[in-house]
Regions:
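C-terminal, surface-exposed recognition/capping segments
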Residues: 3-137
Length: 137
């Protein structure tokens, strides 16, 4: 997931329309497809470290810029090399919260990471018009 954020050339597209449950929304994030990202590794940072057992998650802080970056605004020019994630809001206590639909998107991964010496956290890719990053919950 980290490759998509730091090497996937994320672009916020506030113009693209999409629908959910019969409602029209607007906005989401474009990322390069994994076969278009040089050296893509699903469970590694770009330096080769396996993030599933990385002790950095012990000190994860969502306000630390280490875990996020600013996306480019607008649709990418190489759209056929990209995939789109709609800004569908987020899941809270098992319920999809769409009040931020069109502005904020959050997608869980199936990759657990060690949060401290005894517990695991789930990883979440999140984005808005001004930020794209990783959360460890």
């Amino acid at each position: 997931m980290s490759y998509y954020i730091w090497h996937g050339n994320p672009h916020w597209d506030g113009e693209l329309l999409w629908t959910k449950l019969g409602q029209i929304y607007q906005g989401g994030m474009w990322f390069l497809k994994k076969d278009k990202i040089s050296g893509f590794k699903a469970s590694q940072y770009s330096n080769g470290t396996d993030y599933r057992s990385n002790s950095n998650w012990k000190t994860w802080n969502e306000n630390d810029p280490y875990w996020q970056k600013t996306p480019v605004s607008g649709k990418p020019s190489n759209i056929n090399d990209c995939f789109f994630l709609p800004a569908m809001g987020y899941v809270n206590a098992g319920t999809l919260n769409m009040n931020l639909g069109g502005y904020y998107g959050a997608y869980w991964t199936a990759t657990p990471v060690l949060g401290d010496d005894t517990t695991y956290r789930a990883l979440l890719l999140h984005f808005s018009p001004t930020v794209v990053g990783i959360e460890g919950q």
